[in-house]
Amino acid sequence: MAARLVQRCSRLLAASTAYAPATHTHIHECMKVCHPAQPVLPCSSLHSSSLCRHKDKALTKEQTVSSVPEHGKFESVLESLSSVEELLQLGVDREISGNQAAMIITQVSKVLMESKAQGGSVVQDERFQQLLVQAHNQISTIWNGNLVSLLKRLYILGIREDNKQLQAVENEVRWRLRRLSFKSLVQLSDLYVTFTRSPEQKHLVSDLVKNLELRWTEIEDAKSVVTLMTRVGFISKALMEKLEDKALEYAEQFTPDEMRKVALALAAQNRRTVPLLRALSYHLVQRHIGLSPAVVVDLAFAYGKLNFHQTQVFQKMASDLLPKVPEMSANDIARCVKSFAYLKWSNLPLFEAFAQASIDQSEKFTVPQLCNLVLAFGRLNFQPSKREEFYSMMHQKLHAELDLLDPYLLVDIVWSLCVLRQVDSSYISKVLEPGLYSRFFTDSSPRSANYRLKLAHINATALLEHPEYTGPHLPNESISTTHAVTANRKLSPLQSGLQEVLRELFPVEGTCRCGVNTVYGWYIDGEVVLDSDNKPLSLMDLEAPHLPHSQGKKPLPEGTRRFAFVAWDFPNFNSRSKDLLGRFVLTRRHLQAAGFLVVEVPYYEWLDLKSEWQKSAYLKDKINKVVAEEMAR
């Protein structure tokens, strides 16, 4: 009972001492709270910081009310002055407080920014230095909002980080963090990521983030969410998770530019937050607002980086971007087409416009930007309608700087030209020189392993599609090392299911090979040789030039056909399409050039087959169709 009395009385006494000493009336009020009907406060309310906070708020309110008229008059005087000279002289002509000195410094910085003038001479001015001293001497009297603005303006004016007055302002801000409004915390977040350099400033940022983690529920507008996500979200994972929740809450209020910033913030941290991305996509599609090229380019980059597919958003991007392609810069076109290629999404009118823009503005496109176009077209197997003009321009520019390209980029470009059927002997010989390809075979990194595979594909292009080529080739021992890439790959359910059915369809040992690594760098799910009556032959004695180490020497009998079974999974196709990506078009071409009849098994047909009998009948039907097509040629 005594504890409850002390607890309740302390709250009333703390509030009353802010204005007047205790009186008989106060004591009487304290006695009244002993009535059992009054609610019991939690013990945490007795904490001394809570009592002090009541007093601080009361005193602050009293000071604010008394100084509002004075502040309003001085602010009107500041707004009437339009030059730096007048503002500096104001501090000399009249007696000012530290708060007013901070306001003058802030206004001086604004005028300098508007006039785009240099602030070096102003900072050295004796009157400006006197303003700094005045603000420093009375720093405790500067209002919170003015203090944050002062700190920002001192950074913008280029005040050195070891300046005594600047350090005093930083320390004061750090001590006041808990008393600053949430809006001021957001302003500090926007400020400090740009200007943080010294250890003290980094400590302030750390304290700022801790305060934001505790007070994130005070966010009341979409702009604050965007600012915090882009400026400090990467510092704290816990804060970023809270900000994502708030972004989901305010997604409907985001402008397209704010959606762009949120998407970029997620992409920068590789945070694939699907609910938030879906919400952004929904509101982008629902609003009948045109997207600017800058917004489309950044959104495409973010979606590509996060591998997030949303067809309706892509269609809106394309429709909004198509009429503006002639006005886009070469860099924006290159970035946009690269992002869409990552997403495996091809819009024919938009890509035609990109190709036409590169032809019309060829002098503005650098070689790296043209390389982005070629890589994207190769990945998607896109051929522009004006291919002769486009490739003529591209070859002319590319040959001029071929020796200057990074080896990795050079291999990518030549490989893409192989896909697009635009490679010639000069490109092939360049990448198959021992001095260039040897660096990829001595490097054991996963990245180099992928490029060794691409070199095998380029070598296969020279062997199968360019009989006139007389330059260097990859040695057999180098090609054998590329098999490790596919040998360690886990089979997809489609591949394992196909191989299982093939073994049942051709049960005689030696008549069917499954999981074949070829010298061309391609993986075949199954291989059989059938005679003219569609009966399988033993593969052991037959020559197999596609194998690294073939034991058979006997040529194929007349009338026999060699079949290659390849499974096409969902990732092998363009998004929302039945068109293969360029890599797998090249696979089919090379296998056909090597003498195979290719039996393609796409996922969208295989999934409809439920029983083993259906799958066996499906493969037999596929074989008959391929034979019929071959005979019809």
UniProtKB/Swiss-Prot annotation:
Residues 563-621 form the RAP domain. InterPro entries: FAST_2 (IPR013579), FAST_kinase (IPR050870), FAST_Leu-rich (IPR010622), RAP (IPR013584). GO terms for cellular component: mitochondrial matrix; mitochondrion. Keywords: Mitochondrion, Transit peptide. It is found in: Mitochondrion matrix. One of its GO terms (biological process) is regulation of mitochondrial mRNA stability. The keyword Transit peptide applies. It holds the Pfam family RAP. Plays a role in processing of mitochondrial RNA precursors and in stabilization of a subset of mature mitochondrial RNA species. May play a role in cell cycle progression. PANTHER family: FAST KINASE DOMAIN-CONTAINING PROTEIN 4, FAST LEU-RICH DOMAIN-CONTAINING. Belongs to the FAST kinase family. This is FAST kinase domain-containing protein 4. It comes from Xenopus tropicalis. The lineage of its organism: Eukaryota, Metazoa, Chordata, Craniata, Vertebrata.
